[in-house]
């Protein structure tokens, strides 16, 4: 077994070993918060910095001089302006904020890409992925660790085909990202729902009933009483999850559960940044307008917040 397979098995075994009967498994995919800072521009622009750059990148700007911050911000603006018309719209800014918040996903894809693009042609075929991930264990029809790797491979192949938009079984980096992180792509959400239902639907009737729903979250340990959160989840299932009150969740009800329509924090922040920076009030930003408000977008080591507030109030 190669290192990748060993680590995969180790992580799975560790997860099983460390899990406790009363721990709650959360299958709901929420949009992450843009920042753990309070969004109060009267006190600081830290929330805006985290939202625009991502929390880790925002820290690097705190070490720059104002001149360095402005220069680097100008380069970022050029990337945000997708259609290169010289303006940054709310939609372009929203897309950038979402990218900044999910930079870790792209970093994860980059790491995995190097291990799967075996012929280094800038693409990852299903054969490359299968050989790199399952090549060794498939030779052993009855592995000692008990995992059904063939079943896992069939499931991965189905997801790979869904991510592969042109159906050539060769993934571009964007398609490979959709394969590894399907919850981030609208066209992959059905496969996320399907896989979730397969995991929970123990009697394979195509639905998730109350006991299957609870059983996925909680393993009863002997004669102990159910934790309070389990009772709450039972109520949630009856009152909110099972919308048509037939005692089980179908595909659409499961989708509403695990992929809720959250408040779009990225769009709200994009509109806020445009409102605060749009000097001529034309609904879009020039590079000059953004750089002029660099303290709002990125800050710097030498930003005087009192002076920044004066400029903020002038607009």
Swiss-Prot record:
List of residues binding Ca(2+) 6: 278, 280, 282, 284, 289
Residues modified to Phosphoserine: 44, 69, 261, 277
Keyword annotations from UniProtKB, A to Z: Acetylation, Calcium, Endoplasmic reticulum, Glycoprotein, Golgi apparatus, Membrane, Metal-binding, Phosphoprotein, Repeat, Sarcoplasmic reticulum, Secreted, Signal
Keyword Lipid metabolism on entry: no
Residue stretches making up the EF-hand domain: 68-103, 104-139, 151-186, 188-223, 229-264, 265-300
Entry keyword ATP-binding: no
Binding site for Ca(2+) 4: 201, 203, 205, 212
Residue sites binding Ca(2+) 1 per the record: 81, 83, 85, 92
Modified residues (N6-acetyllysine): 165
Glycosylation sites: 131
SUPFAM superfamilies documented for this protein: EF-hand
Residues binding Ca(2+) 3: 164, 166, 168, 175
A GO molecular function held by the record: calcium ion binding
Subunit and partners: Interacts with GGCX.
Entry's family note: Belongs to the CREC family.
Identification of the protein by name: Calumenin
